[in-house]
Amino acid sequence: MPKAAKSAGHAHDHGAPRPLIPALDFANRQIPAHGTMAVDFEQRVDFHRLREYRLARAMQALEATECGAFLLFDFYNIRYTTQTWIGGAQGDKMSRYALLTRDGSPHIWDFGSAAKHHKLFAPWLNPDHSHAGMLGLRGAIHPEVGLIKEAVTTIKGLLHDAGLENAPIGVDLVEPAFLFEMQAQGIEVVDIQQDMLGA
Protein backbone atom coordinates (compact mmCIF):
# COMPACT_ATOMS: atom_id res chain seq x y z
CA MET A 1 0.00 0.00 0.00
CA PRO A 2 1.39 3.49 -0.83
CA LYS A 3 2.62 5.56 2.08
CA ALA A 4 0.04 8.26 1.40
CA ALA A 5 -2.77 5.73 1.62
CA LYS A 6 -1.36 4.30 4.85
CA SER A 7 -1.11 7.77 6.32
CA ALA A 8 -4.67 8.64 5.37
CA GLY A 9 -5.99 5.39 6.81
CA HIS A 10 -3.98 5.87 9.98
CA ALA A 11 -5.42 9.34 10.48
CA HIS A 12 -8.95 8.05 9.96
CA ASP A 13 -8.46 5.26 12.52
CA HIS A 14 -7.71 7.79 15.25
CA GLY A 15 -10.40 10.27 14.26
CA ALA A 16 -14.07 10.09 15.15
CA PRO A 17 -15.83 7.92 12.55
CA ARG A 18 -18.59 9.62 10.62
CA PRO A 19 -22.05 8.47 11.77
CA LEU A 20 -23.04 6.78 8.51
CA ILE A 21 -19.79 4.88 7.99
CA PRO A 22 -20.01 1.43 9.66
CA ALA A 23 -16.97 0.52 11.76
CA LEU A 24 -16.25 -2.78 10.01
CA ASP A 25 -12.46 -2.65 9.67
CA PHE A 26 -12.01 -6.01 11.40
CA ALA A 27 -8.37 -6.38 10.29
CA ASN A 28 -7.28 -3.53 12.56
CA ARG A 29 -9.28 -4.59 15.60
CA GLN A 30 -7.41 -5.93 18.60
CA ILE A 31 -10.57 -7.65 19.83
CA PRO A 32 -12.65 -9.22 17.01
CA ALA A 33 -15.81 -9.34 19.13
CA HIS A 34 -16.18 -6.62 21.75
CA GLY A 35 -17.84 -7.51 25.02
CA THR A 36 -21.07 -5.74 25.94
CA MET A 37 -20.20 -5.09 29.59
CA ALA A 38 -18.68 -1.63 29.96
CA VAL A 39 -15.36 -1.36 31.81
CA ASP A 40 -12.98 1.50 32.48
CA PHE A 41 -9.91 -0.18 30.98
CA GLU A 42 -11.20 -0.96 27.44
CA GLN A 43 -13.32 0.72 24.79
CA ARG A 44 -15.97 -1.85 23.98
CA VAL A 45 -19.37 -1.10 22.47
CA ASP A 46 -19.47 2.60 21.56
CA PHE A 47 -23.09 3.32 22.41
CA HIS A 48 -22.69 7.05 21.77
CA ARG A 49 -21.66 6.30 18.21
CA LEU A 50 -24.46 3.73 17.88
CA ARG A 51 -27.05 6.35 18.85
CA GLU A 52 -25.60 8.87 16.39
CA TYR A 53 -25.52 6.26 13.63
CA ARG A 54 -29.15 5.22 14.10
CA LEU A 55 -30.45 8.78 14.19
CA ALA A 56 -28.39 9.74 11.14
CA ARG A 57 -29.84 6.81 9.21
CA ALA A 58 -33.39 7.79 10.18
CA MET A 59 -32.71 11.41 9.21
CA GLN A 60 -31.34 10.24 5.88
CA ALA A 61 -34.60 8.34 5.31
CA LEU A 62 -36.67 11.40 6.26
CA GLU A 63 -34.71 13.72 3.99
CA ALA A 64 -35.23 11.35 1.05
CA THR A 65 -39.00 11.96 1.29
CA GLU A 66 -41.24 14.99 0.96
CA CYS A 67 -42.39 14.57 4.55
CA GLY A 68 -41.93 17.32 7.07
CA ALA A 69 -41.64 14.75 9.85
CA PHE A 70 -41.97 11.09 10.72
CA LEU A 71 -44.51 10.17 13.41
CA LEU A 72 -43.49 6.81 14.86
CA PHE A 73 -45.60 4.38 16.87
CA ASP A 74 -43.66 1.18 16.21
CA PHE A 75 -41.71 0.78 19.45
CA TYR A 76 -38.63 -0.48 17.62
CA ASN A 77 -38.60 2.68 15.51
CA ILE A 78 -39.08 4.74 18.66
CA ARG A 79 -36.03 3.03 20.14
CA TYR A 80 -34.07 3.49 16.90
CA THR A 81 -34.63 7.26 16.77
CA THR A 82 -34.85 8.29 20.44
CA GLN A 83 -32.72 5.52 21.98
CA THR A 84 -35.38 5.00 24.65
CA TRP A 85 -36.98 1.71 25.68
CA ILE A 86 -39.82 0.73 27.98
CA GLY A 87 -40.45 -2.98 28.38
CA GLY A 88 -43.55 -4.85 29.38
CA ALA A 89 -47.10 -4.18 28.28
CA GLN A 90 -46.45 -0.60 27.21
CA GLY A 91 -44.73 -1.90 24.10
CA ASP A 92 -47.89 -2.97 22.30
CA LYS A 93 -50.47 -0.51 23.65
CA MET A 94 -49.76 2.24 21.09
CA SER A 95 -49.38 4.79 23.88
CA ARG A 96 -45.76 5.75 23.17
CA TYR A 97 -44.88 7.75 20.09
CA ALA A 98 -42.05 9.83 18.70
CA LEU A 99 -41.87 12.73 16.26
CA LEU A 100 -38.76 13.09 14.13
CA THR A 101 -38.60 16.46 12.38
CA ARG A 102 -36.03 17.85 10.00
CA ASP A 103 -34.06 19.55 12.78
CA GLY A 104 -32.85 16.09 13.87
CA SER A 105 -33.94 16.45 17.50
CA PRO A 106 -36.69 13.88 18.13
CA HIS A 107 -39.62 14.30 20.50
CA ILE A 108 -40.85 11.38 22.61
CA TRP A 109 -44.21 11.02 24.36
CA ASP A 110 -44.33 8.47 27.16
CA PHE A 111 -46.24 7.82 30.36
CA GLY A 112 -45.27 10.29 33.06
CA SER A 113 -42.67 8.37 35.07
CA ALA A 114 -40.97 7.21 31.87
CA ALA A 115 -40.79 10.77 30.55
CA LYS A 116 -39.10 11.77 33.81
CA HIS A 117 -36.77 8.77 33.54
CA HIS A 118 -35.66 9.85 30.06
CA LYS A 119 -34.85 13.34 31.34
CA LEU A 120 -32.66 11.81 34.05
CA PHE A 121 -30.96 9.00 32.15
CA ALA A 122 -31.10 9.89 28.43
CA PRO A 123 -28.95 13.04 28.18
CA TRP A 124 -28.75 12.68 24.39
CA LEU A 125 -32.40 13.81 24.24
CA ASN A 126 -33.37 17.45 24.57
CA PRO A 127 -35.05 17.49 28.02
CA ASP A 128 -37.83 19.69 26.63
CA HIS A 129 -38.57 17.00 24.03
CA SER A 130 -39.45 14.29 26.56
CA HIS A 131 -43.19 14.64 27.14
CA ALA A 132 -45.69 12.92 29.38
CA GLY A 133 -48.58 11.68 27.30
CA MET A 134 -51.34 9.12 26.96
CA LEU A 135 -53.53 8.08 24.03
CA GLY A 136 -56.16 5.38 23.65
CA LEU A 137 -54.41 2.20 24.79
CA ARG A 138 -55.71 0.44 21.69
CA GLY A 139 -59.28 1.53 22.29
CA ALA A 140 -59.40 1.17 26.07
CA ILE A 141 -59.72 4.97 26.33
CA HIS A 142 -62.49 6.14 24.02
CA PRO A 143 -61.55 8.83 21.48
CA GLU A 144 -64.38 10.99 22.90
CA VAL A 145 -62.25 11.50 26.01
CA GLY A 146 -60.15 13.83 23.86
CA LEU A 147 -56.63 12.54 24.44
CA ILE A 148 -56.05 11.74 20.77
CA LYS A 149 -57.42 15.10 19.63
CA GLU A 150 -55.17 16.90 22.11
CA ALA A 151 -52.13 14.91 20.96
CA VAL A 152 -52.74 15.67 17.28
CA THR A 153 -53.26 19.36 18.08
CA THR A 154 -49.92 19.40 19.93
CA ILE A 155 -48.12 17.70 17.04
CA LYS A 156 -49.71 20.11 14.56
CA GLY A 157 -48.49 23.03 16.69
CA LEU A 158 -44.92 21.70 16.71
CA LEU A 159 -45.03 21.32 12.93
CA HIS A 160 -46.37 24.87 12.58
CA ASP A 161 -43.57 26.22 14.77
CA ALA A 162 -41.05 24.43 12.53
CA GLY A 163 -42.63 25.84 9.36
CA LEU A 164 -43.82 22.38 8.31
CA GLU A 165 -47.57 22.79 8.68
CA ASN A 166 -48.21 22.18 4.97
CA ALA A 167 -45.87 19.20 4.58
CA PRO A 168 -47.14 15.61 4.69
CA ILE A 169 -46.39 13.55 7.78
CA GLY A 170 -45.04 10.03 7.47
CA VAL A 171 -46.46 7.38 9.80
CA ASP A 172 -45.13 3.86 10.31
CA LEU A 173 -48.02 2.38 12.31
CA VAL A 174 -51.20 4.03 13.58
CA GLU A 175 -54.54 3.40 15.25
CA PRO A 176 -57.57 4.27 13.10
CA ALA A 177 -58.84 6.87 15.59
CA PHE A 178 -55.50 8.67 15.52
CA LEU A 179 -55.34 8.56 11.72
CA PHE A 180 -58.87 9.93 11.38
CA GLU A 181 -58.09 12.75 13.81
CA MET A 182 -54.98 13.72 11.85
CA GLN A 183 -57.04 13.85 8.67
CA ALA A 184 -59.79 15.83 10.42
CA GLN A 185 -57.20 18.44 11.42
CA GLY A 186 -55.98 18.74 7.84
CA ILE A 187 -52.75 16.74 8.10
CA GLU A 188 -51.75 14.75 5.03
CA VAL A 189 -50.61 11.30 6.15
CA VAL A 190 -48.31 9.04 4.13
CA ASP A 191 -46.96 5.53 4.77
CA ILE A 192 -43.26 5.45 5.69
CA GLN A 193 -43.08 1.95 7.14
CA GLN A 194 -40.69 0.77 4.43
CA ASP A 195 -38.59 3.92 4.73
CA MET A 196 -37.95 3.19 8.40
CA LEU A 197 -37.27 -0.48 7.70
CA GLY A 198 -34.66 0.66 5.20
CA ALA A 199 -33.07 2.93 7.77
Give the predicted meaning of each segment.
Residues M1-A199:
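A composition/biophysics-driven feature that prefers long, compositionally simple stretches
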